[in-house]
């Protein structure tokens, strides 16, 4: 496992692999890797000759009162996960390597970023798109892998790649869950034992919504009500949003006639967790 710290070094290596006709996969992460990340790395290693995992806590996607300073970091643990997943290399730059002094160029996408997480985190996706576009430029991979837990992020990145004619395939990968249904997340480490137990309310509430949809319910407000009512039975839970949106446009729908994304964001104590599922009409 080789660890690159500079743009020039990782770019040179990837270009050399490409000259040899090798396929390269990229797994962009902020580190503190878990089984969800490992599943992305494993998929990338099966579909490519070489895999680069980027580990970079990107400051431009955090708001003023968010958890940039406390975001968990453990490079040794990350190296172990990358090794198990059969990654070839890690790109672990410092902030100064990724952003020069007085950097003034950012990538901003309208429409898709305005609802869901974008409503309460207004600068988040500008930071995400900027750093991901930089990574795509630094590491000219054939494919990039992202988890479907961050469904809005996945949709936004796919749109950015389409709109900017970036030559890379964006691959979405299924949500990986704990045994009790909680979606794997680096932020789960913030939860106390009581909060961790309460956090299962997210998946339980989505499961109730899924059952209602499978039984024929098509009114989005009814689905939102089912989820919200169940979440509100948990004293430690505070809803940020519960939405039913078109899977492609991420616009709210009133009546479900095609594929929709059912997405939620909930504070358990001070920790903000997200989860979702996609419902496909048969």
From Swiss-Prot:
| Enzyme class at the top of the EC tree | ligase
Q: What is its main location?
A: cytoplasm
Record Pfam families: Pantoate_ligase
Residue positions binding (R)-pantoate: 61, 153
Q: Where in the cell is it found?
A: Cytoplasm
Q: Which InterPro entries match?
A: Cyt_trans-like, Pantoate_ligase, Pantoate_ligase_C, Rossmann-like_a/b/a_fold
Is-annotated flag, keyword Ligase? Answer: yes
Instruction: Please state the pathway this protein functions in, per its UniProt record.
Output: Cofactor biosynthesis; (R)-pantothenate biosynthesis; (R)-pantothenate from (R)-pantoate and beta-alanine: step 1/1
Q: Which UniProt keywords apply?
A: ATP-binding, Cytoplasm, Ligase, Nucleotide-binding, Pantothenate biosynthesis
Q: Where is the active site?
A: 37 (proton donor)
**Which family, according to UniProt?**
Belongs to the pantothenate synthetase family.
This protein is called Pantothenate synthetase
Protein species of origin: Enterococcus faecalis (strain ATCC 700802 / V583)
